[in-house]
Swiss-Prot record:
Annotated organism of origin: Azotobacter vinelandii (strain DJ / ATCC BAA-1303)
EC assignment: 2.7.7.72, 3.1.3.-, 3.1.4.-
Name of the protein in question: Multifunctional CCA protein
Residue span, HD domain: 228-329
BP GO terms, sorted: RNA repair; tRNA 3'-terminal CCA addition
UniProt KW keywords: ATP-binding, Hydrolase, Magnesium, Metal-binding, Multifunctional enzyme, Nickel, Nucleotide-binding, Nucleotidyltransferase, RNA repair, RNA-binding, Transferase, tRNA processing
Length: 418
């Protein structure tokens, strides 16, 4: 029995990056032997075990053969006769097909180290095209390593396009797709993930609502980058630069879907795109089986992001409706996430990335003013039920009027014209 360190741990060590987890391949052993040594089986599809002391994953060396459609359409063969090289050859990219023996010697049959040095994401073999999930994985690696100068090899991009055109991507389960998409959105360059998918035709297959945004113009006065798709990529890049959580990045990804439905004769204006986009946002959320918090925020950002951008112009009554819609009294964190998404939207414009966004502070102050209204004095007046709700609403509206007047001063009301 021989044990080798494989995959990401080897790759990241050679790149000088932190190694967060280590995977191992076991050659020349059977499942029964590992069980006898105290390893715990965890693999549902192929023999993977957890080390009894470290908890790290140990997999028996295996080969795989295409036997059906999609990510799960493979037959696996694991036995003591499978060699390390055979196991490495089934992997997706050359940079993931390296191993180290127990003395730290590198085993690199696919020239992964050379591709690391030359910054290529290159497939190991033509068998790459048998697994549609690899399209998403390569795009995710492109998003992760773009800051280091990595790019997808032309021949690999061609295979990705072949997969996209084959219809195999439609066989991916929502759960597998969401796992890759959500991980990719949290990489250092989520914009590269979307662009890579688009360049190979996969975006049209997986997220056609987003693909439809490219080539759609916006008013240059507000969007110097003009193209809605390019704006979306810039917003995602701002999300990464500001360390936004997944829920904000997902909302930003979907916030402008309505612009993809605007008739060309109405360009570059997109009247009521917020409302028009809600049906599309719901469709993407359902298809991807996004978590509930991601679904909720994406719909709220899609519907109300223009309210946020115009926050300083909103009447106190409209502002109160916005705060109540977000339930800022019980769910303040969701309102913070909404503000963050809108700020990323505003910063994702060519040349305006560093412009201040005073709407954020203004809305936070408005929420604080509304929350500061005390309920107890109203209860002491004997108010209850609907009467209490109406009285509380009046007091909050009064507080917002005072807040706007105090913060904006002479701008609280429209200036007189001569």
């Amino acid at each position: 029995m021989r044990i080798y360190k494989v995959g990401g741990a080897v790759r990241d060590r050679l790149l000088g990056r932190p190694v967060s987890e280590v995977d191992w391949v076991v050659v020349g052993a059977s499942a029964e032997e590992l069980l006898a040594l105290g390893y715990r089986p965890v693999g549902a599809d192929f023999p993977v075990f957890l080390h009894p002391r470290t908890g790290e994953e140990y997999a028996l060396a295996r080969t795989e053969r295409k036997s059906g459609r999609g990510y799960g359409g493979f037959t696996f063969h694991a036995s003591p006769e499978v060699t390390l090289e055979e196991d490495l050859l089934r992997r997706d990219l050359t940079i993931n097909a390296m191993a180290e023996d127990e003395q730290g010697r590198l085993i690199d049959p696919c020239h992964g180290r050379r591709d690391l040095e030359q910054r290529w994401l290159r497939h190991v073999s033509p068998a790459f095209a048998e697994d549609p999930l690899r399209v998403l994985r390569v795009a995710r690696f492109a998003a992760r390593y773009a800051p280091l100068g990595f790019r997808v090899a032309p021949e690999t991009r061609a295979l990705m396009r072949q997969l996209a055109e084959s219809g195999e991507l439609q066989a991916l389960t929502a759960e597998r797709s969401w796992k890759e998409i959500s991980r990719a959105l949290l990489e250092p360059r989520p914009d590269v993930f979307i662009r890579t998918l688009r360049d190979c035709g996969a975006l049209h297959e997986l997220l056609p609502e987003i693909d439809a945004l490219f080539g759609v113009p916006q008013p240059a006065a507000h969007h110097p980058e003009i193209d809605t798709g390019e704006h979306l990529l810039a917003v995602l890049r701002q999300c990464a630069e500001h360390g936004q959580p997944l829920v904000v990045r997902w909302a930003c990804l979907l916030h402008d879907l309505g612009k993809g439905t605007t008739p060309a004769e109405e360009w570059p204006r997109h009247i009521a795109h917020e409302r028009k986009g809600l049906k599309l946002i719901r469709a993407v959320n359902t298809r991807c089986k996004a978590p509930r918090d991601c679904q909720e925020l994406s719909l709220l950002v899609g519907e109300y992001h223009s309210h946020c951008h115009r926050a300083l112009e909103l009447r106190p009554a409209t502002l109160l409706e916005l705060l109540q819609r977000f339930d800022v009294y019980r769910r303040p964190q969701r309102f913070e996430e909404f503000i963050a998404a809108c700020e990323m939207d505003a910063r994702g414009r060519l040349g305006l990335e560093r412009r201040d966004y005073p709407q954020a502070g203004y809305l936070r102050g408005a929420a604080a003013a509304a929350r500061a209204v005390a309920v107890q004095p109203l209860l002491e007046k004997g108010l209850a039920g609907a009467a209490l709700g109406e009285a509380l609403k009046r007091e909050r509206l009064r507080a917002l009027k005072a807040y706007k007047s105090d913060v904006l001063g002479e701008r609280a009301e429209p200036p007189e014209t001569s």
